Amino acid sequence: MAKAATTLKTASVLAFERKLANSDALMYAGNWAQQDNWTAIAIQEKSVRGTISNRLKNALTSDPAKLDAEIQKANLQKVDVAALPFGADTLKIVFTLRVLGNLAQPSVCNDQDYQTALGDIITGYAQEQGFSTLAARYAENIANGRFLWRNRVGAEAIRVVVTKKGERSWEFNGEDYSLRQFSQPAGDLAALTQAIEKGLAGDASALFTVEAYVQLGNGQEVFPSQELVLDEKARNGKSKILYQVNDVAAIHSQKIGNALRTIDDWYPAADEAGPIAVEPYGSVTSRGKAYRQPREKMDFYTLLDNWVIKGDVPMPEQQHYVIATLIRGGVFGEKGE
C-alpha cells in the first residue's frame, strides 16, 4: 500500500462540476407593508456631466492655470442605472439554488488510480466529518443575505424566505446573523442546514427558491451586476452597463455563488480579514491579495496533493476547506511542464 502511495501522481486532467448550482438573481420593486405586488426593475439610461476627479499629472497640478483649464473640460458620461420607483420602498431579489451530491465522482479524470484515491478521501471525509459544517455555513450565507452585496448596506430591514420545492419554507431576519462570524445553527437555520447537507451527501433532492426582501426607501438606487463589455461598439458610448435578463435588472449567478461560498475563515489572516470566498489560492480580487500562499503550504493544491499523494491528513478545518473547494468546482489537473 505504501508503495502505491509513492507512485501515485496527480492526474493531468481533473475537473469537478460545481455542487452549488445557483441561477442569476432577478430584481423586483414593491412595498414592505404590502408584499404581494411586485414589478420588475428595469435598467434606465442616464446622461450626466461629471467632474474631473481622477488623479492628474504633476505638470497640471503644479500649474493653477492649467489645472483650472483641465477641470473646466466637460466629463460627459452615459451610464446605466437602476432604482426603485418612488412608489416603492422595498427591493425583492429572487434566485434558485440546486444542491448536488456525488462529490466523490469528478466530472473528468484521466488517471483511474488517482481518481480512486481521491474518491476514497472524499468518502472518508463524508463518513468521518460529514457535510454539516459546510452546509451550516452555506445556509447562514443565505439567511444573512450576503448575496445582496451592496444592496444590503444601510437597509432598514432584511427578510429572507427559502422554499424547498415540494416541502416547506423557512424565514429569516437577515440582521440576526453576522457577516464576520458563523453561529451554531438552531431552529429554521438548523432545518435549512440539514436540507443542504442531505443534498451534498446525495441523500435527497435539494432545489431551493430564495427570496430576499430589502427595505431601502422610496426611489432608492439598487445595484445589479455590472457588465464587462470589451467591444467598444457594443458599449454604445456607455461607461457603465448593468446586467439584465429579459429586461429585468439582475445579479450574475457568479456573484451570487461567490457570496454563498464565502465561508473560508480557516486561513492564517482570518481574524483580521474575516471570511473569504473559497478559492484555490484564497484570492480576493477586490483587495488584490491571495490569502492562501503556496509558500505557506495552505493553498488548495498543496493541501490536496499532500492528502491524496502523501497521505498527510490536514487538520479538520483545512479538510473542510479542501472539500469546499471541490464543491466550488473547477479544473484542478496538474499542469504540464
From Swiss-Prot:
Oligomer and partners: Probable multimer. Part of the probable Csy ribonucleoprotein complex with cys1, cys2, csy3, cas6f and crRNA.
Highest taxon listed in the record's lineage: Bacteria
Name of the coding gene: csy3
Family to which the UniProt record says this protein belongs: Belongs to the CRISPR-associated Csy3 family.
Keywords for the protein's UniProt record, in alphabetical order: Antiviral defense
Induction: Expressed in late exponential phase (other phases not tested); part of a large cas-CRISPR3 polycistronic operon.
GO biological process, alphabetically ordered: defense response to virus
CDD domains recorded: Csy3_I-F
Pfam families: Cas_Csy3 (PF09615)
Name the record gives this protein: CRISPR-associated protein Csy3
